[in-house]
A protein has these predicted regions:
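N-terminal loops that bind phosphate or other acidic moieties
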Residues: 1-135
Length: 135
């Protein structure tokens, strides 16, 4: 059983689409939420929504952010600096979201490293990937 909640944070409708696609692959995922930053939304307003979604129930929260240095990541990181139960990873992709959704256990350093590895491993250029598999 997963001992943490997951929030997907990012620009526009990407977080909602990533959530929907994760659930398409995995089935309904408890404690999975998405918070997208709209083009007209201020960083302060976005921060209010993200804080409300993260909540205050003292359970650990993994925030998967779309872009390092973007407003969603900056806001999530600021929240994480004030709350050690919040862990942020930038550069989130579908492989990472699926791996996190299916994870058992706690949100610890080993899981964070595994999620980053899974995310990186899924980024390949097909011809080079095929050539490596053939040789």
């Amino acid at each position: 059983m997963r001992g943490f909640r997951i929030v997907i944070a990012g620009h526009g409708t990407l977080p909602a689409a990533l959530l929907a696609t994760t659930e398409l692959i995995c089935g309904e995922i408890p404690d999975l939420a998405a918070v997208g930053l709209s083009a007209s939304e201020s960083p302060d307003h976005y921060a209010e929504g993200l804080r409300a979604t993260i909540g205050r129930d003292h359970r650990p929260v993994l925030v998967l952010c779309d872009l390092l240095g973007g407003t969603p990541f900056n806001v999530a990181s600021a929240i994480g600096r004030r709350s050690p139960r919040v862990v942020c990873i930038a550069g989130a992709n579908l492989a990472m979201a699926v791996e996190a959704a299916l994870a058992d256990g706690d949100l610890d350093d080993a899981l964070v490293e595994r999620l980053i590895e899974v995310g990186r491993a899924g980024i390949v250029e097909t011809e080079r990937h095929r050539a490596r598999r053939v040789s």
